[in-house]
Amino acid sequence: MNRIETAFKNTKPFIGYLTGGDGGFDYSVACAHALLRGGVDILEIGFPFSDPVADGPIIQKAHTRALKEKTDSTTILEIAKALRQTSDIPLVLFSYYNPLLQKGPQYLHQLKAAGFDAVLTVDLPIPRNANESESFFQALMEAKLFPILLVTPSTQEERLLQISKLAKGFLYYVSHKGTTGIRSKLSDDFSTQIARLRRYFQIPIVAGFGIANRASAIAALEHADGFVVGSAFVEKLEKKISPEELTTFAQSIDPRQ
């Protein structure tokens, strides 16, 4: 059983996101450990990219900071290896398609060997006539990495049916239109949207994009099977808070504590 499947067996997981290499290798690893101590059950590690169009200003700046630290594909592997020395937490690579396409299938096997369990490719074309993405899904399968896929409030039925045949581990529901960022509350139609998705998907459904406090996490868990916090953590890293402070902040969001 994949570590991600195990994470959903007894709880509704708290999923955290950090951009790999933000603040440098050592700080990035220390902050990842801090999130684990703060209650995070699954960790997404962002692969820094020069054109992160799906992200809002907070995470865009994190990509820039990480690239200035010379974070590259090897750094991402080393971060995972460092975490695997002491932790069995599920790891998801959060990436744009282009860097992975450029690296080729061999890199996916390197990700698996380093300790990653899944890949979420935010701008991946879902196969219809896109031969490249079809081969990418095949490469993920061969590397034994789960494809984590995104859906939005506007994803149409035909697309949902296609995605339901490909997604594994969990479905990532983008709970707000637009880019990543911090929002004060979930959308008014959140429960309706989750109910709609359950007609198509048997895997767990988690909510992300905008969850930044305990109140929105509680609201998400009323209907979803887990929740993701990203921008709220990344904003703290921009301020160079200590790992201890980051642990405390994560605990303040987690409604299960």
UniProtKB/Swiss-Prot annotation:
Reaction(s) catalysed by this chain, per the record, are: (1S,2R)-1-C-(indol-3-yl)glycerol 3-phosphate + L-serine = D-glyceraldehyde 3-phosphate + L-tryptophan + H2O
* Record keywords: Amino-acid biosynthesis, Aromatic amino acid biosynthesis, Lyase, Tryptophan biosynthesis
- Among the Pfam families in the record, one is Trp_syntA
Cite the EC number: 4.2.1.20
Q: Locate the active site.
A: E44 (proton acceptor), D55 (proton acceptor)
GO cellular component term of the entry, any: cytosol
Q: Which domain of life is it from?
A: Bacteria
Gene3D superfamilies named among the record's database cross-references: Aldolase class I
* Pathway participation: Amino-acid biosynthesis; L-tryptophan biosynthesis; L-tryptophan from chorismate: step 5/5
PROSITE patterns in alphabetical order: TRP_SYNTHASE_ALPHA
Per the record, the similarity remark reads:
Belongs to the TrpA family.
Q: Cross-referenced NCBIfam families, in alphabetical order?
A: trpA
What does this gene product do?
The alpha subunit is responsible for the aldol cleavage of indoleglycerol phosphate to indole and glyceraldehyde 3-phosphate.
* Oligomer and partners: Tetramer of two alpha and two beta chains.
HAMAP family for this protein: Trp_synth_alpha (MF_00131)
UniProt name for this protein: Tryptophan synthase alpha chain
Gene that encodes it = trpA
